[in-house]
UniProtKB/Swiss-Prot annotation:
Its main location: membrane. Pore-forming subunit of a potassium efflux system that confers protection against electrophiles. Catalyzes K(+)/H(+) antiport. Gene3D superfamilies: 1.20.1530.20, NAD(P)-binding Rossmann-like Domain. It comes from the Bacteria. The keyword Mitochondrion does not apply. Interacts with the regulatory subunit KefG. Disulfide bonds: none annotated. The gene is kefB. SUPFAM superfamilies: NAD(P)-binding Rossmann-fold domains. GO terms for biological process: proton transmembrane transport. PROSITE patterns: RCK_N. This is Glutathione-regulated potassium-efflux system protein KefB. Keywords: Antiport, Cell inner membrane, Cell membrane, Ion transport, Membrane, Potassium, Potassium transport, Transmembrane, Transmembrane helix, Transport. The chain crosses the membrane at residues 4-24, 29-49, 55-75, 87-107, 115-135, 152-172, 177-197, 207-227, 230-250, 268-288, 291-311, 324-344, 356-376.
């Protein structure tokens, strides 16, 4: 692809994403399906703006690479070791059982047994990009089903190499003996990468961070991700696996959050490009000429994988409320099928339109997943949002809540318990189905669903409620919910949780003045108690705490328009001197005017 063509393709990709994704979100079908439909529209079987799909698809796999790096950052080695049973137990069982069943079904058609084996293995794989994206959207990351789903995906990445090595053996074109020297060199290179990454990455990033230039840190992060991907590709291994390992090696470093911040924008754009490329690869000609075969194949593929995954989840002990989420999110074919089937085609394992039919089946199965998860959500909503059992005593008897609490994690539970203890009518919205199931057993009126959906807020009583308390884990969800409430329910008093000063600034800019930084108040209280243990009178310690709170809030408001670090540092030093002067005056005025408090608890 020439430079001008590449630039034109980039413009078309951006235009397709900007046009299709907001429309898809408005229609309620999700961003992923919007990307896929945009790809169909601009691809060779749509308007025909782009024809070189294979090259773009290979480039767009970098989105999966960046995503796996961020996933690795969230998993330290000890956590990965804890997942070994689910990775090599459930993951291996899923691949083997699904591949065997699907290969058997393919053999019932015109597929030779060799082609059926390759087809079964390829179809058994799930889409890492699709599944992880949907897991994040559904809040499954920290749930049992989400952890198990990630384990299955990780094993599938590990299974890439033996699957590719199996193709020439099935085609009868493998050498009579393996090149053990070549294999040994690859193993040594891989071990060298692990050792080098373990002992060199942190010192290198410490040196780069010392320069104080943010752009260089971002460049170094990109170099690490792309370099590890290229290195693994040269070894014939999965690029995504390489970047995942690099992320795990840095998971316990002090640069973890900065690395994630530097990578996140690239990950989002490239993941969108990947889904658009998958949509472009859909061969509508084959779909038209073999419509019945393709439809049956997609239904059978999704059904077989759901059956296998559901049974494995049940055997593994996953809660019944989470099994369908786990099975549904992994029910599609994956991007690895494109690589495996292309390799098999080069070895002449497929005949006629067999490869095209399999690829169309994989692509359409990926398009069914967002819709399938919508159905799962509706089923879960009916299952867990219905009326309480007769022996349960609901906290709220009125259908018109005074307060809606969004998120019922540790932060939200404290707020909810306080409100309910004071007989306030509240409704709680939570998208972690395991938390919903558990809390409802204890009598809490908790409902399953994504609170960023206007219809759900309306059905939860937002039009009649007086206030909404937002305690989402993700700052992006908080800001999106603030915008929705201000637009559709302007009468609501918005109270929000801020994870830190950055989120506090964003809330203030959005006009939200009632917020709480999750560690600020508890840290202030512990600081007050520390002052008392050091000999300060409890009343003075309380006043010192109040002065600090007021000054910190004032400084927070003053720094909203200031983005330069040097300005913030200068203002912080000035505020510290001001606080010291206030405390000195307080001490002089109140040294002999204590209120006689013995303690303040």
């Amino acid at each position: 692809m020439e430079g001008s063509d590449f630039l034109l393709a980039g413009v078309l990709f951006l235009f397709a994403a900007v046009a299709a994704v907001p429309l898809a979100s408005r229609l309620g079908i999700g961003a992923v399906l919007g990307y896929l439909l945009a790809g169909i529209a601009i691809g060779p079987w749509g308007l025909g703006f782009i024809s070189d799909v294979d090259e773009i698809l290979h480039f767009s796999e970098l989105g999966v690479v960046f995503l796996m790096f961020i996933i690795g950052l969230e998993l330290n080695p000890s956590k990965l070791w804890q997942l070994r049973r689910s990775i090599f137990g459930v993951g291996a069982a899923q691949v083997l059982l699904s591949a065997a069943l699907l290969a058997g079904l393919l053999m019932l058609t015109d597929f030779a047994w060799q082609a059926a084996v390759v087809g079964g293995i390829g179809l058994a794989m799930s889409s890492t990009a699709m599944a992880l994206q949907l897991m994040r959207e559904k809040g499954m990351n920290r749930s049992e089903s989400g952890q198990l789903g990630f384990s299955v995906l990780l094993f599938q990445d590990l299974a890439v190499i033996p699957a590719l090595a199996l193709v020439p053996l099935l085609a009868g074109s493998a050498d009579e003996h393996f090149d053990w020297m070549k294999i040994g060199m690859k193993v040594l290179a891989f071990v060298g990468m692990l050792i080098g990454g373990r002992y060199l990455l942190r010192p290198v990033f410490r040196f780069i961070a010392a320069s104080g230039v943010r752009e260089v840190f971002t460049a170094a992060t990109l170099l690490l991700v792309l370099g590890s991907a290229l290195f693994m590709d040269a070894l014939g291994l999965s690029m995504a696996l390489g970047t995942f390992i690099a992320g795990v090696l840095l998971a316990e470093s002090e640069y973890r959050h900065e690395l994630e911040t530097a990578i996140d924008p690239f990950k989002g754009l490239l993941l969108g490009l990947f889904f658009i490329s998958v949509g472009m690869s859909l061969n509508l000609g084959v779909l038209y000429t073999h419509l019945l075969w393709v439809v049956i194949s997609v239904v059978v593929l999704v059904a077989v994988k759901i059956l296998v995954l559901y049974l494995l989840a049940r055997l593994y002990g996953v809660r019944s409320s989470e099994r369908m989420q786990f099975a549904g999110v992994l029910s599609q074919g994956g991007e690895f099928a494109f690589v495996l089937f292309s390799t098999a085609s080069s070895q002449r394992l497929f005949q006629g339109d067999q490869m095209a039919l399999l690829l169309v089946t994989v692509t359409l199965s990926m398009m069914t997943t967002p819709l399938l998860m919508k159905l799962v959500d509706k089923w879960l909503s009916r299952q867990f949002n219905g009326p309480e059992e007769e022996d349960e005593k609901p906290w709220v008897n009125d259908d018109k809540p005074q307060v809606i609490v969004v998120g019922f994690g540790r932060f939200g539970q404290v707020i909810g318990r306080l409100l309910m203890a004071n007989k306030m009518r509240i409704t709680v919205l939570e998208r972690d189905i395991s938390a919903v199931n558990l809390m409802r057993k204890y009598g809490y009126k908790v409902y399953y669903g994504d609170a960023t959906q206007v219809d759900l807020l309306r059905s939860a009583g937002a039009e009649a409620a007086e206030s909404i308390v937002i305690t989402c884990n993700e700052p992006e969800d908080t800001m999106k919910l603030v915008e929705i409430c201000q637009q559709h329910f302007p009468h609501l008093h918005i109270l929000a949780r801020a994870r830190g000063r950055v989120e506090a600034h964003e809330l203030l800019q959005a006009g939200v003045t009632q917020f709480s930084r999750e560690t600020f108040s508890s840290a202030l209280e512990l600081g007050r108690k520390t002052l008392v243990t050091l000999g300060m009178h409890p009343h003075q310690a309380q006043r010192a705490q109040l002065h600090f709170r007021r000054l910190d809030m004032r400084m927070l408001r003053e720094l909203i328009p200031m983005h330069a670090d040097t300005v913030q540092i200068s203002r912080a030093r000035e505020a510290r001197r001001e606080l010291e002067e206030i405390f000195q005056r307080e001490m002089q005025q109140e040294r002999r005017q204590l209120d006689g408090w013995d303690e303040f608890e």
